Amino acid sequence: MENDNFVVLKNVCKRFGDNTVINNLDLEIKKGSLVTLLGPSGCGKTTVLRLVAGLEKPTSGQIFIDGEDVTNTSIQQRDICMVFQSYALFPHLSLYDNVGYGLKMLKLPAAEIKQRVDDALKLVDLSGMGDRFVDQISGGQQQRIALARALVLKPKVLLFDEPLSNLDANLRRSMRETIRDLQQRFNITSLYVTHDQTEAFAVSDTVIVMKDGEIMQQGSPDDLYKTPSSMFMANFMGDANIFTGRYDDGQLNINGYCIPADPEVVQGKAEGDYQIGVRPEAILLTSEGEPSQQCIVNNVVYMGSMYEVAVTWHDQELLLQLNSSQFDANLSDHAYLTINPTGIFLLPFDA
């Protein structure tokens, strides 16, 4: 086992009766990194988390933590902690006792428990609130207590099971920042599960996208968005306008509109016909252009931070996302589009 691969799943399968939920999965998490499992409901991401935790046993395959085979090891012996979607706090205990519960189970000295609990409450900005009870604090504060309860045990691995799904948008944003800051500060190897792409991108070093119990693609958030490996990935990672076009002689030809090919986009690609994807933010509208660039503006929706614009170009409806400085309210229904070469990706027709 390589030293920097702290959590490793090797050829893991999980079946419930005749239903295969995880199919020959290989996964590696480097020490101190945060890896997120992202995917639609039923893709198997939560099952993987439960396998790492020891809440489920694999049908076949092996699981290693810190070089040790823990495939058949109980959850109590794995030195991991989990932060749940439901918080799982004890309503009859004070916040102090909730955070210190695991330490008491370890029968640590009272003075050490007090110091570690006080430190943990300070980390999550809840100092001085230890004597309150769960029903006296907000949902965001409850999630901070759940996080403090995990951190106070100083686990080898920290697991997050959709921890922010019960919070409103502003609290989710704040808690994303808190989780990422504390994870990096303490260099805790972490596995995070969510169905929210924005959340995954905000907290992760690496994102692993799953579908039907298998890994579809993994990489940095930037890599997954800019270079999807399949049509599923292209659409799952955000809106995409898909064309049939050609890469030839350093240019991309889409509906007769020739665009200089960005070297990073076409790196390793042979010349030929492709499915060409263009992200909505890579298309701009102007009042002048070549005939091949002419389009019809069908609809404009103000979204606060941006405008979503629907246009028809060569009988195909496209989605554009323009910020306020890019959108001209005086633009006529007949406009011209330009495409930023860096917002393009190429896929073979069988992807």
UniProtKB/Swiss-Prot annotation:
Gene3D superfamilies: 2.40.50.100, P-loop containing nucleotide triphosphate hydrolases. GO terms for molecular function: ABC-type ferric iron transporter activity; ATP binding; ATP hydrolysis activity. Signal peptide: none annotated. GO terms for cellular component: ATP-binding cassette (ABC) transporter complex. Residues 7-237 form the ABC transporter domain. It catalyses: Fe(3+)(out) + ATP + H2O = Fe(3+)(in) + ADP + phosphate + H(+). Belongs to the ABC transporter superfamily. Fe(3+) ion importer (TC 3.A.1.10) family. This is Fe(3+) ions import ATP-binding protein FbpC. The gene is fbpC.
